[in-house]
Amino acid sequence: MSFQHRQIEKKWQDYWEDNKTFKTDTFSNKEKFYALDMFPYPSGQGLHVGHPEGYTATDILARMKRMQGYEVMHPMGWDAFGLPAEQYAIDTGNSPAEFTNQNINTFKRQIKELGFSYDWDREINTTDPNYYKWTQWIFKKLYENDLAYMDEVAVNWCPALGTVLANEEVIDGKSERGGHPVIRKPMKQWMLKITAYADRLLEDLNELDWPDSLKEMQRNWIGRSEGAEVTFSIKGNEGTFTVFTTRPDTLFGATYAVVAPEHPLVKEITTLSQKEAVQNYLDEIQTKSDLERTDLAKDKTGVFTGAYAINPVNGEEMPIWVADYVLMSYGTGAIMAVPAHDERDYEFANTFGLPIKEVVAGGNIDDEAYTGDGEHVNSEFLNGLGKEEAITKMIDWLEANGSGEKKITYRLRDWLFARQRYWGEPIPIIHWEDGTMTAVPDEDLPLTLPQVAEIKPSGTGESPLANNTDWVNVVDPETGLKGRRETNTMPQWAGSCWYFLRYIDPNNTERLADPKALEEWLPIDIYIGGAEHAVLHLLYARFWHKFLFDIGVVSTKEPFQKLYNQGMILGEGNEKMSKSKGNVVNPDDIIDSHGADTLRLYEMFMGPLDASVAWSTNGLDGSRRFLDRVWRLYVGDDGSLTDKIIDDESTELDKIYHETVKKVTDDFEHMHFNTGISQMMVFINECYKANKIPKIYAEGFVKLLSPVAPHLSEEIWQKLGHSESISKATWPAYDESKLVEDEVEVVLQIMGKVRSKIQVPVDISKDDLEKAALDDESMQKWLEGKTIRKVIVVPGKLVNIVAN
């Protein structure tokens, strides 16, 4: 008989909600365990089967830890600001807030139907003014500590749409919507000085229990480089420019310089004869993204400015070019080109007929750039030296001659913290007519978004908020000074930088969260989510956390002690699930046909949690069959317990039961859920073979199953005679003495060749083992007509007989 999943699941979901079964006591005396999911963006599509994979993993840990006596924090909320809701509002004329709330309701229903043990009293929503009041407060603190500033930054400007576009909205230089031309245009933007934390973000990675691959991605993103900054003067011009290089030892081989098209020097140094060519080039590359500009495979383009730099080390003139492969946002926006020893410079020099001078021996520069190590040549005081020695000597020379200095630089850029959008947190800053800026006072937070009838582009590059003059224009009541509110809003990353702190104290109106509560619960014990957030979200959250640590809000340097990335669930043919391929699996359908417990079990059993695995309907059916077998083992056709479960002590399942408790506990702790479930299946097979199942083992098994299949387990637990939820029960313990084998298999050999195997007691003596080997029927056949010369006995392993 199959269990009725629809009735059982609804019954227990209602029970948990009515009884607040999973409510967390913030100041409990128990040991704390904080299990966190990456909260979702509530899209219009609803939940997909990828979401429950990570959520089930944290839920298993949360449920097990509760039963092990921990106070567990396991919350859920909504990362609800974002572009899709604004786009929907522009397209339909409806409110993004209403659209977002509808989506949240769908997500919440779906998540509740999966039976996750969330404390819904801690639910947060990043678009709730009571929440973003504190996002604004953190921004204010960053501003007060000189970590938020305004700067001119090139953005993707679409004149036809009258708006700034995010990188992901631009495809091949055109807007994703409508295919209009997009150009790069400098605009004043808010920046956060994440670079001030670069070293700490790098060093503290060593203290975290994170996957090595993920730590490496963050290290590469921060990209610490040691080298030198070199200053070049310009022939016939007062100006200078600096370049950063990791190879100052190759300065004698620098034969030309390249500056980014956006470099302020370009206008200053371009000669009259080159002005037109330079302007044409600047117009031509306006539509290219940074990614296109730095593509190694693309043909090199550039134009000569007509100006020359002076190489400080040998006084030689170097032509200054403008080329799009140099970015203003990286380094100083200018490079010294050493074409003999850099592939990109070599290609550029060959394209434009620029000189190539060897300064490191070992290659053939007529054929290609030599990027290996070797002795320095054509380098005066560096000749004959190796790389490291030459770098040190050149830096000493640069510093002694006032031409440069040792420098550490980072690939990490400051964080562009502004979006020209309506649907985001308003930035709490006022720009006054006298050119000053002030932050909105704390007592006026939250600065809420104004209600608008429709969202339309401002046409000026400002956000749609600029259209709302009543909201934008302000007057200082004390001085009469006129001002304008900041019209940019925060990026979607803002709310997710600190949401895990608010869960700890979600209704506090006086402060971000109670410091004592934060101290109780931080750092987070386990954070599970997709690897696509490896860099941005996790780096930004670490940056904000370190800042909050510095100003005394939190007491830990890092927010997430242990982090785990779940893999991706692919379509049946090993392809990514997508609507266009028609291979998307909707969890609602599975919950209806197979049940939430089956979906949870299957997603944990389909493979290792961190692997990408293809969805299989057969696998799903197999998971349901296993749960049906469990049900039939416990529950008869009349709905009562089967006769197989007895109160007596029977020993036939001793070993397999204690093995199962040990393996499931260990595997769940280490997030090897698939092998833990596999062991449960082995146990159920043994139960079917056994004559009787002691009730204590029957109960122990249901406890082990309950984190994976909670609804079914609650129902069986009730049938076993319990009135309280199984989540209040104690996690089973195993007895080491029951795991010990009382018998062992011994290999029997003649002249080193295996001829038989026997089972013997573990504590058998050497003499008895020798006798048992000689008495074995198979051995007697092999020994017939032979003389035994020697018997070698290795207790617990083998007996080898030398005979001829």
Curated annotation (Swiss-Prot):
The EC number(s) this enzyme carries: 6.1.1.4
Main EC class the enzyme belongs to: ligase
NCBIfam families in the cross-refs: leuS_bact
SUPFAM superfamilies: Anticodon-binding domain of a subclass of class I aminoacyl-tRNA synthetases, Nucleotidylyl transferase, ValRS/IleRS/LeuRS editing domain
The gene coding this protein: leuS
Name recorded for this polypeptide: Leucine--tRNA ligase
Subcellular location: Cytoplasm
Glycoprotein in keyword set: no
Domain of life according to the entry: Bacteria
Keywords: Aminoacyl-tRNA synthetase, ATP-binding, Cytoplasm, Ligase, Nucleotide-binding, Protein biosynthesis
GO molecular function: aminoacyl-tRNA deacylase activity; ATP binding; leucine-tRNA ligase activity
Reactions catalysed, as given in the entry: tRNA(Leu) + L-leucine + ATP = L-leucyl-tRNA(Leu) + AMP + diphosphate
CC per GO annotation: cytosol
Alphabetical list of CDD domains matching this protein: Anticodon_Ia_Leu_BEm, LeuRS_core
Family: Belongs to the class-I aminoacyl-tRNA synthetase family.
Pfam families: Anticodon_1, tRNA-synt_1, tRNA-synt_1_2, tRNA-synt_1g
Binding site residues for ATP: 579
GO biological-process terms attached to the record: leucyl-tRNA aminoacylation
Source organism of the structure: Oceanobacillus iheyensis (strain DSM 14371 / CIP 107618 / JCM 11309 / KCTC 3954 / HTE831)
Motif ('KMSKS' region): 576-580
Motif 'HIGH' region, chain ranges: 40-51
